[in-house]
Amino acid sequence: LRRVSLDLVGLLPTAEEARAFLADSSPNKRDRLIDDLLGRDIDYTEHWLTFWNDLLRNDYDGTGFITGGRKQISGWLYEALRQNKSFDAMVRELIAPPDAESFGFIDGIKWRGTVSVAQSLPIQFSQNVSQSLLGINMKCASCHDSFIDRWTLAEAYGLAAIYSEEPLELFRCDKPTGVIAEAAWPFPEIGQIDPAATKQERLDQLADLFVHPENGRVPRTIVNRLWGQLMGRGIVHPLDAMGTEPWDADLLDWLASDFQQNGYDLKRTLRLIVTSHAYQSSGDAVGGVAEGGNYTYNGPSPKRLTAEQFVDAIWQLSGSAPAAFDAPFSRGVVS
């Protein structure tokens, strides 16, 4: 009860909820509890907003960027989660924004002063879309052919050129090469970008490729992230290295296929995971890492409360939640 409440809505169950759950002898009480939690749209949204803010680099609000240079997507993201917008629709609106509400993700951060070429807006675009949505770390490849993965400088710049308004010269370790990048998608088996198209057309083509029915990379990446968030460790680990061998490839493929075939429904996939025996089993305090480094799943890994969960728990237990806030909010004050 405590685990699933914190995982799905970020809040501890109340004493009344705990007593009612323990007194309920019906065999489907866990399923009903999970459906009730997922139906608490505001609590669900405000809890999972933290996960998506981190993933989409929307939590950055420091002073390093030029004023007005980057628009956060908080309003769009909040509504997408509250409405349980399908993930493929979210991806389309992030990659090829239909309006200003979701532009912040691809626009990146305009740093003050002179910065490395690897921090230019087109390269940030390449790094962000590949890491967040494909589980690919393009940061090394943005400077030189990666030493730790298969990705090359040309592939990193190929993605960057999709976004770039101007011809984009490849720089290796901040030194110009004289080579102009050609807009390209790194998985040509399912299609390719037309380099001669306009920027908006290229972004539309890229969005189509991200949600292509034969693109298994995107659904695998997001279900692996959801599994990792709930279980403490992904089926593929690290989460941003999807080229790593999964500890159970069949499980990953099945979850990704189910996700695709059922409308990219995030809540449905969360429900699928938390109703499983794997999630509801006893926690694994040692983390499942056996001698030699091989991972064996022995149960969910214990997780610390997040900062948000900790504050909410203190407010809930002490009855000290603020009576007024300095910004609009939707979550009810716990009494």
Task: Name each model feature, range by range.
Residues K199:
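Glycine- and hydrophobic-rich flexible loops that cap the catalytic core of alpha/beta enzyme folds
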Residues P195:
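Flexible, polar/acidic helix-loop-strand segments at domain edges
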Residues V211:
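Cell-envelope and extracellular/periplasmic
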Residues L1-Q192, L203-L206, N215-S257, Y264-S335:
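Short, structured secondary-structure elements
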